Regions:
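Chalcogenol-based redox active-site neighborhoods
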Residues: 1-153
Length: 153
């Protein structure tokens, strides 16, 4: 199980435009990686828009933000366009990253069990270690909560 202090697992995924993005691209920089279940769903829209609305504070402090789901590049393009998102979304269609970050598993809704992505966020420091893991997220204020925890707000 991933814990604070562990090295963040490497990843190599395409963003919404088909550009390869890797953990090593962010060496020397703080990074927020937030995993979410599905493009264009109510909670995911609120969370993404929270980061969108706070992205200038992140940029000002040289912090990158990545959203990750198992949706396709095309789905991400549509999501970004509709919500006017201003940070990359990674397409983990093969479920490599959701598995390496341990956010893929059995979920339950209305008594029905299914496999899906848990809403979870990782704060990665400049050396590539995990500074914090958010197991529970308040979608509407999550971006502000991260800034507060990194003492940036």
């Amino acid at each position: 199980m991933l814990s604070v202090g562990d090295n963040a697992p490497e990843f190599n995924l395409n963003d919404q435009d088909g550009k390869l993005v890797q953990l090593s691209d962010f060496k020397g920089k703080k990074l927020v990686i937030y995993f979410y279940p599905k493009d264009q769903t109510p909670g995911c829209i609120k969370e993404a828009c929270s980061f969108r609305d706070n992205i200038e504070s992140y940029k000002k402090h040289d912090i990158a933000v990545l959203g990750v789901s198992i949706d396709s590049e095309k789905s991400h393009q549509n999501f970004m366009s509709k919500q006017e998102l201003n940070f990359p979304l990674l397409a983990d269609v093969e479920k490599e990253m959701v598995n390496s970050y341990e956010v893929w598993g059995e979920k339950s809704m209305y008594g029905r069990k299914y496999m899906g992505t848990f809403r979870k966020t990782f704060l990665i420091n400049e050396t590539g270690s995990i500074d914090k893991i958010y197991e529970k997220v308040k979608v509407a204020t999550h971006a502000e909560d991260v800034l507060t925890d990194w003492e940036i707000s």
